[in-house]
């Protein structure tokens, strides 16, 4: 099955956990990776699923992160190139 990736970057690990919980409840997506930088002060959450589900999940994550004032960036990648999975350690 071809799927899309959704990424949301926030400040602070606690905020990332709260956001991820809502993202997973908002749509049929799977949590696949996290990247922590600056000792956990900057966290990127990665989910995958069907494009519409990933968009809904990322939109929900952005709303939660904005509410807490911790949003840094977000992105949805439809049909990601297989080389991206090496970066995420999913190959």
Regions found by a protein language model. Give the residues of each.
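Helix N-cap motif at beta-to-alpha junctions
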Residues: 48-54
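Conserved short beta-strand edge segments in small beta-sheet-based binding/regulatory domains
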Residues: 67-79
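Short glycine-/aliphatic-rich beta-strand segments at the starts of folded cytosolic domains
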Residues: 1-10
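Short amphipathic alpha-helices in soluble, non-transmembrane regions
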Residues: 57-63
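Short, low-order "capping/linker" segments at domain edges
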Residues: 83-91
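Short amphipathic alpha-helix segments
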Residues: 14-26
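A short linear hydrophobic-aromatic micro-motif
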Residues: 29-34, 73-74
